[in-house]
Curated annotation (Swiss-Prot):
This is UPF0738 protein GWCH70_0774. InterPro entries: UPF0738 (IPR020908). Belongs to the UPF0738 family. The lineage of its organism: Bacteria, Bacillati, Bacillota, Bacilli, Bacillales.
C-alpha cells in the first residue's frame, strides 16, 4: 500500500533544511528512508520515498519549495523531514535529486511542464 504526505513548508535551522508536514494524516513512527526519489509530473513535484514493513510513503515536494531545496545541491546542507513529532534525515537526497534533474533535462517523457519547471529552478 502507498501513503502520501505533502510538504507544507520549508525552514532552515540548526544547519539543516527541514521539510515540514505540520498535520500528517498518519504517523511515521515505523518509517525509514528508502534512499530513492521519483517524479510526479502531474503535480510538478519530486517524491522522496519512505518505507515501513507494510507500506511505501511518498513525501511530495511541490515546485513552490524547489528554490529552497536547490541549496542542498550546492552546499551539501543535510535535509530532514519533520512530520508531526517525528523527525528523520532524508538520506541520499542530494544524489537522487541530482540524478533526476540530469534525467529530466531534455527528456520529453517527464512532460513539458515538469521539464520547464526543472529548467527554471535548477538549470539556470
Amino acid at each position: 500500500m502507498q501513503k502520501k504526505l505533502v510538504v507544507e513548508k520549508v525552514e532552515k535551522r540548526d544547519e539543516r533544511l527541514w521539510l515540514i508536514c505540520d498535520h500528517p494524516p498518519f504517523s511515521l513512527e515505523q518509517a525509514r528512508p528508502k534512499n530513492h526519489m521519483l517524479v510526479d509530473s502531474d503535480n510538478i513535484a519530486f517524491i522522496y520515498i519512505l518505507e515501513t514493513d507494510e507500506d511505501f510513503i511518498y513525501v511530495a515536494i511541490p515546485s513552490e519549495f524547489w528554490m529552497d531545496i536547490k541549496q542542498v545541491l550546492t552546499d551539501g546542507t543535510p535535509i530532514f523531514l519533520q512530520s508531526g513529532t517525528i523527525e528523520m534525515e532524508l538520506t541520499h537526497f542530494k544524489e537522487e535529486l541530482t540524478y533526476l534533474i540530469e534525467n529530466i533535462d531534455g527528456n520529453a517523457n517527464y512532460g513539458e511542464q515538469m521539464e520547464q519547471a526543472v529548467k527554471e529552478i535548477f538549470l539556470t
